[in-house]
Amino acid sequence: MEYLPLFHNLKGRTVLIVGGGEIALRKARLLSEAGARLRVVAPSIEAQLVELVQAGAGECLDRGYARQDLQGCVLAIAATDDEPLNATVSQHANALGVPVNVVDSPQLCSVIFPAIVDRSPLVVAVSSGGDAPVLARLIRARIETWIPAAYGQLAGLAKQFRAQVKARFANVQQRRVFWEEVFQGPIAEQALAGRTAEAERLLAEKLAGVAPKALGEVYLVGAGPGDPDLLTFRALRLMQQADVVLYDRLVAPAIIDLCRRDADRIYVGKQRADHAVPQEQINQQLVTLAKQGKRVLRLKGGDPFIFGRGGEEIEELAAHGVPFQVVPGITAASGCAAYAGIPLTHRDHAQSVRFVTGHLKDGSCDLPWSELAAPAQTLVFYMGLVGLPVICQQLIAHGRSAETPAALVQQGTTSNQRVFTATLGTLAGRIAQEDVQAPTLLIVGEVVQLREKLAWFEGAQAAGR
């Protein structure tokens, strides 16, 4: 090991930065976050750097570096493009026993800056010893995805109770077991969900020896339109810890595969005129499973609150006192339009956008057609494949031009995506000649014409243009 990792308490202590440019500013920001008092020396200092230093009660010296600038400093940073000056700062600092870092010159450094993942008070540092800083940053980026931002709250909870736990358990082994149970159980889940008061209550009860009750919970998670890369970090974390998964027809198989492998999987999908499981039964099933102490993942395509009946499900949970979390997902309108190269709003074409259900009931759509036919707006119809001819006819009948551009997106954001473009007057006829597979999304408006120059996600699906 070439360098020993240490964490330095810089609160209120003076750090010298030689240099007044962008590199010095980046170092100053990091040091300021650690509570250091900054002394910046350079003939010319950027305004942002001056402002940052003054906000932290530091000092800016508008002149060249002098050896005495190191007096009283616990760390020195050379951040200039003047190599002889950087070498001089390093030499002086080493002679005085002051740790020194010279940017991009590891051979002149007695200390180096790692790549940092900050979940204060939890901090992770990654270093290559200055040999491969880009690699260290790439590893840091991966760690950023593994450690939720809320872990800082969890670490803060541990700090709050540390003294009490130490007083309760004199044995180090007992304390270790206690904290492992906390960090891997429902107390941690409450903290990560932002329910700090509940986490504190449960932790206090655990310290007092109160037997915990089986604490079930429902995670209502939006799975997005299909591409697994569009899942949120929070969604993925909950997917990988649930005991049982209830999933819809619109959830892509690649996303279901990301769920915890030993979790029970229950299909509750619906399709037109065929509800495999009635909604009321789904609601009750969520309540029953959660009251058994299970962590229940309710996985829905798109966003659970946009034509997903998620509101009905959590109403039932709330009525029965079942804890729940809601994780929004990228709704099909946003995801499919973006992957099709169709901006839903545009200053020159559409000043508003409306999301509408295209689901037919008794062969018709009960919609405010006169409002929908107004110009300068984009319409997005969910579940509109079967009702496509009726939708196009009604919009034209109520005043929308038959020449209005329209697009039908099949299985958007996935490798099976196909985009069919035409006009309101011709789209239904074109779709009748194609083998279109649900799920689909219908987009109507002048913005559709922008696809000709903005389409980017094509590949094998280009044949559907």
Swiss-Prot record:
GO terms for biological process: cobalamin biosynthetic process; methylation; siroheme biosynthetic process. It comes from the Bacteria. Pathway: Cofactor biosynthesis; adenosylcobalamin biosynthesis; precorrin-2 from uroporphyrinogen III: step 1/1; Cofactor biosynthesis; adenosylcobalamin biosynthesis; sirohydrochlorin from precorrin-2: step 1/1; Porphyrin-containing compound metabolism; siroheme biosynthesis; precorrin-2 from uroporphyrinogen III: step 1/1; Porphyrin-containing compound metabolism; siroheme biosynthesis; siroheme from sirohydrochlorin: step 1/1. S-adenosyl-L-methionine binds at P225, G301, G302, D303, I306, T331, A332, M383, G412. Coiled coil: none annotated. The active site is at D248 (proton acceptor), K270 (proton donor). The keyword Nucleus does not apply. InterPro entries: 4pyrrol_Mease, 4pyrrol_Methylase_sf, 4pyrrole_Mease_sub1, 4pyrrole_Mease_sub2, CobA/CysG_C, NAD(P)-bd_dom_sf, Siro_Cobalamin_biosynth, Sirohaem_synt_dimer_dom_sf. The modification Phosphoserine is found at S128. GO terms for molecular function: NAD binding; precorrin-2 dehydrogenase activity; sirohydrochlorin ferrochelatase activity; uroporphyrin-III C-methyltransferase activity. The keyword ATP-binding does not apply. Keywords: Cobalamin biosynthesis, Lyase, Methyltransferase, Multifunctional enzyme, NAD, Oxidoreductase, Phosphoprotein, Porphyrin biosynthesis, S-adenosyl-L-methionine, Transferase. Residues 216-465 are annotated as: Uroporphyrinogen-III C-methyltransferase. NAD(+) binds at E22, I23, P43, S44. It catalyses: uroporphyrinogen III + 2 S-adenosyl-L-methionine = precorrin-2 + 2 S-adenosyl-L-homocysteine + H(+); precorrin-2 + NAD(+) = sirohydrochlorin + NADH + 2 H(+); siroheme + 2 H(+) = sirohydrochlorin + Fe(2+). Gene3D superfamilies: Cobalt-precorrin-4 Transmethylase, Domain 1 (3.40.1010.10), Methyltransferase, Cobalt-precorrin-4 Transmethylase, Domain 2 (3.30.950.10), NAD(P)-binding Rossmann-like Domain (3.40.50.720), Sirohaem synthase, dimerisation domain (1.10.8.210), Siroheme synthase, domain 2 (3.30.160.110). Pfam families: CysG_dimeriser, NAD_binding_7, Sirohm_synth_M, TP_methylase. Its EC number is 2.1.1.107, 1.3.1.76, 4.99.1.4. Residues 1-203 are annotated as: Precorrin-2 dehydrogenase /sirohydrochlorin ferrochelatase. PANTHER family: SIROHEME SYNTHASE (PTHR45790:SF1), SIROHEME SYNTHASE-RELATED (PTHR45790). Then it catalyzes the NAD-dependent ring dehydrogenation of precorrin-2 to yield sirohydrochlorin. Finally, it catalyzes the ferrochelation of sirohydrochlorin to yield siroheme. In the N-terminal section; belongs to the precorrin-2 dehydrogenase / sirohydrochlorin ferrochelatase family. In the C-terminal section; belongs to the precorrin methyltransferase family. This is Siroheme synthase. It comes from Stutzerimonas stutzeri (strain A1501) (Pseudomonas stutzeri). The lineage of its organism: Bacteria, Pseudomonadati, Pseudomonadota, Gammaproteobacteria, Pseudomonadales. The gene is cysG.
